[in-house]
């Protein structure tokens, strides 16, 4: 459960932040594909090279979805319901990949936002991403 302090940290470090560009999403995907090559199987029609238009476009979708999750922080289930349905029922993404993506996003944020991305912010954003993953995984049960 996110405390009010956690929510405030998430809102200021992740939500609708002009300094959190779509490039962070693209970089996050690049990290994920490099560290976990099996995740590439969900993108057979994409150019998966670093900085490709496909990665930039999908990376922007990832960041936009996170922005929506931050906006709906108090009702994550309702906010992420359609996204969860899409990934569980249509795309059939292995739910373990949400945690992998979360860890890659944390690495990207820590790399670009240091030193403001200190231990307290890292812990709050990690809790937030765990909550997002949990909601996205809920439609698999």
Curated annotation (Swiss-Prot):
User: Which positions does UniProt annotate for O2 binding?
Assistant: 58
Query: Where are the annotated segments for Disordered?
Result: 1-22
Has UniProt tagged this entry with the keyword Acetylation?
no
By its UniProt entry, which PROSITE patterns does this protein fall under?
GLOBIN
List the Pfam families.
Globin
Please give the Gene Ontology molecular function terms for this protein: haptoglobin binding; heme binding; metal ion binding; organic acid binding; oxygen binding; oxygen carrier activity; peroxidase activity
| Keyword vocabulary terms for this entry | Heme, Iron, Metal-binding, Oxygen transport, Transport
Which residues belong to any copy of the Globin domain? 1-141
Q: One GO cellular component term, please give it.
A: haptoglobin-hemoglobin complex
Respond yes or no to whether keyword Ubl conjugation is given for this record.
no
Gene Ontology BP term (one): hydrogen peroxide catabolic process
Q: State the tissue distribution.
A: Red blood cells.
**Signal sequence residues:** none
Additional remark text: This is one of two types of alpha chains found in viper hemoglobin.
Q: Which named protein is this?
A: Hemoglobin subunit alpha
């Amino acid at each position: 459960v996110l405390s009010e302090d956690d929510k405030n940290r998430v809102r200021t470090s992740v939500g609708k932040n002009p300094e959190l560009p779509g490039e962070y999403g693209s970089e996050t995907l690049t990290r994920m594909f490099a560290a976990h090559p099996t995740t590439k199987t969900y993108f057979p029609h994409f150019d998966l090279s670093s900085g490709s238009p496909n990665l930039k476009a999908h990376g922007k979708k990832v960041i936009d979805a996170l922005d929506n999750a931050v906006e709906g922080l108090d009702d994550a289930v309702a906010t992420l319901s359609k996204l969860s349905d899409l990934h569980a029922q249509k795309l059939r993404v292995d739910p373990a990949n949400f945690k992998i993506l979360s860890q890659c996003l944390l690495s990207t944020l820590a790399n670009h936002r240091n030193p403001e991305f200190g231990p307290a912010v890292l812990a709050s954003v990690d809790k937030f991403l765990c909550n997002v993953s949990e909601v996205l995984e809920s439609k698999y049960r």
